[in-house]
């Protein structure tokens, strides 16, 4: 048995993935040092022949020499893939310059949850799916607060799309823990938005995870991003860090 824990992950979304698309995930070991494994991976759309997403994941695990060799060999196999683009060195930099772990006391409360039995992973802790589910709910509440609510989206056929994200996991969330998501914008561009969520233990105030996301509002008919509406920009500016 190998004990492991995901420490952080960066993702860049490159192309849309359509219903019934055939996908392949290709992994490559970037480094194995000091009980940390850094993996690069790509999600490849076989039918569209393009890369839909790029990931860089840091995992903490205890490896002896034999297991380290097995892991390295496993993730460097390339002869069975349908993807020809196996050169991972050409990715644009996965930078991680963002606000610190400490969350703003003036942040928008975007989600409140509790860890239930159906949220647990094999270690009986709140799973990554539970945490990312909090992120999805928080984004919906944040956009609703700024004016991009359900009715407005339906009337104008507007959606939203994440461009990339950076997540860091700090602590586990055991059964029964009540958590709150605190959210601030970190950048408001002409079309793009960047915001950060901090998932916090209601009892201790400890940060369980944080995630910064770059996203756009998306015209579903034209299939392209749109300029941030002025009303949205005004409300979002009130939540801008250091505003």
Q: Across the structure, where does each feature detected by a protein language model lie?
A:
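Catalytic strand-loop segment that frames the active site of acyl-thioester-processing enzymes
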Residues: 1, 88-148
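Hydrophobic, proline/glycine-rich low-complexity stretches
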Residues: 1-4, 12, 155
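Hydrophobic residues on conserved beta-strands that form the core of alpha/beta folds
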Residues: 6-8, 38-39, 54, 110, ...
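Short structured motifs
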Residues: 6-14, 25-26, 38, 163-170, ...
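HotDog/MaoC-like acyl-thioester-processing domains
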Residues: 13, 17-22, 28-99, 173-175, ...
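Structured core of small recognition/catalytic domains
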Residues: 121-200, 207
């Amino acid at each position: 048995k190998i004990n492991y824990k995901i420490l952080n992950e960066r993702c860049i979304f490159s192309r849309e993935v359509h219903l019934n698309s055939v996908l392949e995930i290709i992994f490559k070991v970037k480094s194995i040092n000091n009980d940390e494994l850094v993996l690069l991976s790509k999600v490849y759309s076989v039918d569209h022949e393009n890369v839909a997403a790029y990931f860089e994941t840091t995992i903490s695990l205890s490896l002896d020499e034999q297991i380290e060799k097995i892991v390295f060999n496993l993730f460097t196999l390339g002869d069975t893939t349908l993807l020809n683009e196996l050169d991972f060195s050409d990715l644009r930099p996965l930078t991680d310059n963002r606000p610190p772990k400490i969350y703003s006391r003036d942040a928008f409360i975007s989600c409140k949850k509790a860890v239930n039995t159906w949220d647990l992973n094999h270690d009986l802790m709140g799973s990554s799916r539970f945490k990312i589910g909090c992120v999805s709910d928080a984004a919906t509440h944040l956009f609703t607060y700024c004016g991009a609510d359900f009715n407005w989206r339906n009337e104008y056929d507007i959606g939203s799309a994440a461009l990339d994200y950076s997540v860091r996991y700090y602590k586990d969330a055991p059964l029964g823990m009540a958590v709150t998501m605190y959210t601030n914008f970190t950048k408001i561009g002409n079309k793009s938005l960047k915001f950060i969520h901090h998932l916090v233990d209601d009892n201790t105030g400890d940060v369980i995870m944080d995630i910064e996301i770059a996203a756009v509002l998306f015209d579903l008919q034209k299939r392209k991003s749109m300029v941030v509406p002025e009303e949205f920009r005004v409300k979002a500016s009130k939540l801008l860090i250091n505003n």
